[in-house]
A protein has these predicted regions:
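M16 family metallopeptidases and their MPP-like homologs
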Residues: 46-56, 82-130, 137-148, 175-200, ...
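Extended, regular secondary-structure scaffolds
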Residues: 212-214, 224, 233-251, 374, ...
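Hydrophobic, small-residue-rich alpha-helical packing segments that form membrane-like cores
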Residues: 151-222, 226-244, 248-275, 281-283, ...
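His/Glu-based metal-binding/catalytic segments typifying zinc-dependent metallopeptidases
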Residues: 41-43, 50-52, 163, 167-171, ...
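Generic recognition of flexible, low-complexity loop/linker segments
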Residues: 95, 211-215, 274-277, 319, ...
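Non-catalytic, conformational "gating/processing" segments within enzyme and secreted inhibitor domains
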Residues: 159, 211-243, 721-755, 942-943
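Non-catalytic terminal extensions that flank enzyme cores
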Residues: 1-48
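Active-site His/Glu-centered metal-binding helix of metallohydrolases
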Residues: 63, 67-71, 577
Length: 969
C-alpha cells in the first residue's frame, strides 16, 4: 500500500513501523463519510475490530450507557430483539463486548476464525449505524428505564437494565467516592457527570433526548475504526466501504471534550454514603485527594506511572508509609489516569475517619515537599521503572486479545485529535526517564504538576446508617405522588405499556429473523485441544515440572505448596501468609529493601491460595498455596534468590508491620466486598454442599469475617507472629512442594542448578497430609448490606443424586446464561445478569448479580426443570449453542497461562483424551440431551441451598428462606 493512494474510499495518509508491538500501522481517512481508520498489520491470528464514537453527555441520565445497550437490540440487517446475545450464543469470538467510558463508547470484537470475524464486524457495524432503537422507544424503556405497573391498584415502580446495573455500582463505596471526586474536579465538562448514569437521574431521560444524542454522536464522521492482526486489509476496507461507509456523507461534528478551567484554589468536601443498620461506622470513611494535571506529554505520562508505583504501590512507598504510620487510613493507594483529556493523579485512603481529612492533605503535601527538597530515593525509582518496563515488554493481558489493549491505549490520544500511534512507542521515553534518574526529573515533575497546582480536590465519604432507607422512602413517596397526579386513562396506559413490554420480552424472534445472524458450521469446530507439554524432573525429592514455551525471554516460576498438612483453623493463617508474602521483613533485611530488590529484578512476585478438584471426584481436591514469580531470563538468579528469601527467610516478629497489613486487608475488603457479591454468595452456597466449597469460602467471605474480627481485637494481634511462623514451618518444606518452571528449551538446567543449593537448605520434616478436615456450613445465609440490589445464588451437587459431569452440561450453561436466565432475570427481571455453572466434581450453581429481585429470582430457578422438559430447538439453534460453548472452552493461552494450565491438569488428574472426549460430547449434543438434564437439576434445587447478599429489607422480607442473617461489615 502507498501513501496518498485511495483504497475502497480510504485515503492512506501514513505508514509507520512500531517495533515495540512488532507491527506496522496504516492511518487512513474515509473520504466520503469522514470516518477515521487505523490498521495494525501484525502476524497475530487473534484479529481485532473496534468502532468507537466520541460520546460527551451533559448530564447524568446515563444516555451514553443506555445507548451502548440499546443499539445492540436489533438493526436493519439483523432485526432480532438482541443480535448481540445471538452472537454470544453462537460465535467463536475471543472477545465480544461494548464499553461506555466517560467520553467515548467502544464496540470491540475479536476472533481467530476469518468467517466469524467477518460476521462479528457486520453485526456490530449494522448495530451502531442502523439500530432499530432510533424508531423504537420500547428498547430504551427496557434497557434504560420505565414505569412498571402490572395492575392499576399496584404501587408504581421503576425498572430497567441500566437503572439496576447502576444501582449496583452506586452500592459500592469506592464508586460513590469516584463519582463525587469527578464531579468536584470537573464541574464544567463532561467528566463532571456520570456517563454510566446516576440512578437518581436516569429516570429524567426522555426518548427525544436519547434520539438527539444518537443523531449527534453516532455518525461515521465521529467514529474511530480500528483493525488489527493477520488479515487481507484491502478486502476489509472494501467491505467497510461498500456495505456501510459509502452510504454516509461527512458532516461537521461538535463532540469535542471541553477543558476544565484550572482552579485558583483547592476544594475540601465530604458526603455521606449508606451502610447497613448493623454495620460498624468507625474506620469506614474513604478519602480521595486528587489533582487535575496541566498538559502532560506521553513521556511524562509514563513517568507518572513510575512515580505512582514508587510513591504509593511498592511496600517501600514513602507517601503510603507516611500516611499509614500517621494513622490516616488502614489502606493507602493511588493511581494516575490518562484516559481522559485532562489527566489526573490521586491518593486514596480507606479504613479512616472523617476527622483525618485535614491531616491527609497536610501529610501528602508536606511529604511530597520533603521528598523534593531532599531528593527521591533513586533506587526506589529505578526499581519502579524496571517494574513498569517489564509490564510493557511482557504485554500479557490475561488472555485478552493484545490488539484490544493497543486500541484502548491509542484512544487516549486519538480521541483528542492527537497522534494515536505515539502511545504505542515507549523505547525513547524509557531512555529519557532512565536518564532522569540521575537528576531532578521526578522532583521537577512533582513540583510542577502537584505542589504548584491548585486544581485539586479532597473528597471524603463517610458512612451513615439509614441513608439508603431514607432515599428509598423518598423514591417511593415521589412515585406515589406521580401516580396520584395521573388520570385513570394515564394509569391504564402504563398498565398496557407494562403488558406490551412483557409480551415483547417473552415473544421469541421469528425463524426468519434468527436466520439473519450468520452462523458457522459444526465442521468449523475442532474437537482436539492443544497439548501443553509438561516434563518432570527432580531436585532431591522435590518434583520440578518444566513447561517448554516460547516466552520472549521471560521465565515464570511457581511453587505449589500442599496445604493438606494444616487444620481448617490454620487455613486462616495460610491466607494471611499468602496476603503478606514479600511484604514483610526477612532475616536478611527490612521489607522496604526487599521490595526495592523485587521491583528492581522481577516482573512480579505474588501468592494465592486455590483448590484443584480431582477430575470427576465428589470431594477430593488438592489445597494449594502458590507462590509465583516472573523475570527476564537474565534475571533468573535473582528470581531464585528472592523467591527463596520470601518463603524461607520471612521474619514474622514485626508486630507493627503485621498489624498494618491486617488493617489494610480489612479496609480493602470493607471497600470491595459488595463488588465481589457473586463470588461470595456462590462460594457460600458451595460451602454448604462440599468440602472444596467450604475451603474456598474460608478464603473468601469466611476470611473477611475472620480478618475483621482479628483487626478489631488488639489482644489477638500479638499472638499472630507465632501463629504465622508455625503455619509457615508446616507449609514451606522441600517435600511439600511441586515447582513449575516455564521457559524455553535449554533454560531448565540453569534453573535447576540455581534452585538445587537453595532447596537443599529447606526443611524436610515429614508431616501427615491427612490433617485437613473441612466442616461444611449449615443453613442458608442472608448477608445484609446497604446495597440497592441483590446477588442471589442457589446450588448443590448432582453427584449426590447419581449423575456425572457431561458435555451437554456446558451447552446448558450457554443456554441458561443467554436464553432462559437472560430473558427471565435480566430482560424481564431487570437484573444486570445471571449465570449457571456445572463443575466436574458435581457442584452446580445458579447466580444472579445486580438483581432488584430476590424471591422472584429463586422462583425462576425453581421453574427451570419445567423449562427444560419443554425444551425444543431447531438444528440451527442447537448448532448455535454448541458453537458458543466451544468458544468458551477455547480461551487463548499466553505464555504466562500455559504453566498454570499444565499444573491444573496435573493436580486434577485430567488426561488430554478426557478433555477431547468432553469436547466431542459438546459437539454431538442434541436437544434431547438438554431435556434429560431436567432430572439432574430438579433434585439439586430441591436440596434448597441458597445464599443472598443485598438489601436488608429485601432479605428480611424473604422470611423463612434464610436460616442465618449476617451483616456484611
Amino acid at each position: 500500500m502507498e501513501i496518498n493512494k485511495v483504497y475502497s474510499g480510504f485515503r492512506l495518509d501514513r505508514i509507520e513501523r512500531i517495533d515495540e508491538i512488532n507491527g506496522t500501522a496504516y492511518e487512513m481517512k474515509h473520504e466520503k463519510s469522514g470516518a477515521r481508520l487505523i490498521y495494525i498489520d501484525s502476524p497475530d491470528s487473534n484479529k481485532v475490530f473496534n468502532i468507537a464514537f466520541r460520546t460527551t453527555p451533559h448530564n447524568s441520565t446515563g444516555v451514553a450507557h443506555i445507548m451502548e445497550h440499546s443499539v445492540l437490540c436489533g438493526s436493519r440487517k439483523f432485526p432480532l430483539k438482541e443480535p448481540f446475545v445471538e452472537l454470544v450464543k453462537g460465535s467463536l469470538n475471543t472477545f465480544l463486548n461494548a464499553m461506555t467510558y466517560p467520553d467515548k463508547t467502544m464496540y470491540p470484537v475479536a476472533s481467530k476464525n476469518d468467517k466469524d470475524f467477518h460476521n462479528l464486524m457486520d453485526v456490530y457495524l449494522d448495530a451502531v449505524l442502523y439500530p432499530r432503537v432510533r424508531d423504537d422507544a420500547e428498547i430504551v424503556m427496557q434497557e434504560g428505564w420505565h414505569y412498571e405497573l402490572d395492575n392499576a391498584e399496584d404501587e408504581l415502580t421503576y425498572k430497567g437494565v441500566v437503572f439496576n446495573e447502576m444501582k449496583g455500582v452506586y452500592s459500592s463505596p469506592d464508586s460513590v467516592l469516584e463519582r463525587q471526586m469527578m464531579r468536584e474536579l470537573f464541574p464544567d465538562t463532561t467528566y463532571g457527570v456520570d456517563s454510566g448514569g446516576d440512578p437518581d437521574h436516569i429516570t429524567d431521560l426522555t426518548y427525544e433526548e436519547f434520539q438527539e444524542f444518537y443523531r449527534v454522536h453516532y455518525h461515521p464522521s465521529n467514529s474511530y475504526i480500528f483493525l488489527y492482526g493477520d488479515m487481507n486489509i484491502e478486502e476489509q476496507l472494501a467491505f467497510l466501504n461498500d456495505e456501510y461507509l459509502s452510504h454516509f456523507d461527512a458532516i461537521e461534528v461538535n463532540t469535542e471534550v471541553g477543558l476544565q478551567a484550572p482552579f485558583t484554589e483547592g476544594k475540601v468536601v465530604s458526603y455521606p454514603y449508606s451502610v447497613g443498620s448493623e454495620e460498624p461506622t468507625d474506620n469506614r470513611t474513604l478519602h480521595s485527594f486528587a489533582y487535575v494535571l496541566p498538559d502532560v506529554t506521553p513521556e511524562h505520562s509514563l513517568a507518572f506511572e513510575v512515580l505512582t508505583h514508587a510513591l504509593l504501590t511498592s511496600p517501600a512507598a514513602p507517601l503510603k508509609q507516611a500516611l499509614v504510620k500517621a494513622g490516616i487510613g488502614s489502606d493507602v493507594s493511588g493511581y494516575y489516569l490518562d484516559s481522559i483529556r485532562q489527566p489526573m493523579w490521586t491518593v486514596q485512603a480507606t479504613g479512616s475517619n472523617l476527622d483525618k481529612q485535614a491531616d491527609l492533605q497536610r501529610i501528602v503535601e508536606s511529604t511530597l515537599q520533603e521528598l523534593c527538597d531532599n531528593g527521591l530515593d533513586k533506587e526506589l525509582l529505578e526499581a519502579s521503572l524496571n517494574s513498569i518496563e517489564f509490564a510493557l515488554r511482557e504485554s500479557d493481558f490475561g488472555g485478552r486479545p493484545i490488539g484490544l489493549a493497543y486500541v484502548i491505549r491509542m484512544m487516549d490520544n486519538w480521541l483528542y485529535d492527537n497522534d494515536p500511534l505515539e502511545l504505542l512507542h515507549y523505547e525513547e521515553a524509557l531512555v529519557n526517564i532512565r536518564k532522569g534518574l540521575s537528576g531532578t526529573y521526578f522532583e521537577d515533575l512533582i513540583r510542577q504538576s502537584i505542589l504548584n497546582n491548585n486544581h485539586k480536590v479532597l473528597v471524603s465519604i463517610y458512612p451513615e446508617r439509614g441513608l439508603q432507607e431514607r432515599k428509598d422512602a423518598e423514591v417511593k413517596e415521589h412515585l406515589t405522588a406521580v401516580k396520584a397526579k395521573m388520570s385513570p386513562e394515564e394509569i391504564e396506559a402504563i398498565v398496557e405499556q407494562t403488558k406490551r413490554l412483557k409480551l415483547r420480552q417473552e415473544a421469541p424472534d421469528s425463524d426468519e429473523a434468527l436466520a439473519s445472524i450468520p452462523l458457522l458450521e459444526l465442521s468449523d469446530l475442532n474437537p482436539n485441544i492443544e497439548e501443553v507439554e509438561r516434563r518432570e524432573s527432580k531436585i532431591g525429592n522435590t518434583t520440578v515440572h518444566f513447561v517448554p514455551t516460547f516466552t520472549k525471554g521471560i521465565n515464570y516460576v511457581g511453587l505449589y505448596f500442599n496445604l493438606s498438612c494444616l487444620t481448617e483453623d490454620e487455613l486462616f493463617y495460610a491466607d494471611i501468609l499468602s496476603d503478606i508474602i514479600g511484604r514483610i521483613d526477612t532475616s536478611e533485611r527490612g521489607y522496604e529493601a526487599l521490595a526495592k530488590d523485587i521491583n528492581m529484578n522481577l516482573g512480579g512476585l505474588s501468592s494465592d491460595i486455590t483448590a484443584i478438584s480431582k477430575d470427576g471426584k465428589r470431594d477430593e481436591f488438592t489445597p494449594l498455596m502458590i507462590v509465583r514469580a516472573k523475570a527476564l531470563h537474565s534475571k533468573l538468579p535473582d528470581l531464585c534468590r528472592l523467591i527463596n528469601e520470601v518463603v524461607q527467610k520471612a521474619d514474622y516478629s514485626n508486630d507493627r508491620r503485621l498489624t498494618e497489613l491486617v488493617q489494610e486487608s480489612k479496609a480493602i475488603w470493607d471497600n470491595e466486598a459488595f463488588r465481589r457479591g457473586n463470588s461470595i454468595v456462590s462460594q457460600r452456597v458451595m460451602a454448604q454442599v462440599s468440602a472444596v466449597g467450604k475451603f474456598r469460602d474460608n478464603g473468601n467471605f469466611g476470611y473477611y469475617q475472620k480478618i475483621s474480627e482479628l483487626a478489631s481485637n488488639p489482644a489477638a494481634l500479638p499472638l499472630l507472629p507465632e501463629k504465622l511462623a508455625d503455619v509457615a514451618r508446616k507449609i514451606f518444606r522441600a517435600n511439600n512442594v511441586d515447582i513449575m518452571f516455564v521457559g524455553e528449551e535449554g533454560e531448565l538446567e540453569a534453573f535447576e542448578n540455581l534452585m538445587k543449593p537453595l532447596i537443599e537448605t529447606w526443611d524436610t520434616t515429614e508431616l501427615s497430609n491427612d490433617t485437613l478436615k473441612i466442616t461444611r456450613l449449615s443453613g442458608n445465609d442472608g448477608i445484609v448490606t446497604a446495597g440497592k440490589v441483590q446477588y442471589v445464588a442457589q446450588g448443590g451437587n448432582f453427584v449426590d443424586h447419581g449423575y456425572k459431569h457431561v458435555g451437554p452440561m456446558s451447552v446448558l450453561e450457554t443456554i441458561l446464561r443467554y436464553e432462559y436466565l437472560w430473558i427471565r432475570i435480566r430482560v424481564q427481571g431487570g437484573a444486570y445478569g445471571a449465570f449457571a455453572n456445572f463443575y466436574d466434581d458435581g457442584n452446580m450453581i445458579f447466580c444472579s448479580y445486580r438483581d432488584p429481585n430476590l424471591v422472584e429470582t429463586l422462583n425462576v430457578y425453581k421453574e427451570l426443570p419445567q423449562y427444560l422438559r419443554e425444551f425444543t430447538l431447531t438444528d440451527r439453534e442447537m448448532r448455535k449453542y454448541i458453537i458458543g460453548t466451544m468458544s468458551s472452552l477455547d480461551l487463548p493461552m499466553t505464555p504466562a497461562l500455559r504453566g498454570p494450565r499444565a499444573m491444573g491438569m496435573y493436580f486434577s488428574g485430567t488426561k488430554l483424551e478426557d478433555k477431547v472426549e468432553f469436547r466431542k460430547q459438546v459437539i454431538a449434543c442434541k436437544p434431547e440431551d438438554i431435556v434429560a438434564l431436567a432430572d439432574v437439576v430438579e433434585p439439586v434445587l430441591k436440596d434448597n441451598h441458597i445464599c443472598t447478599m443485598g438489601n436488608e429489607q429485601k432479605i428480611k422480607d424473604a422470611g423463612k428462606v434464610f436460616d442465618n442473617i449476617i451483616s456484611l461489615g
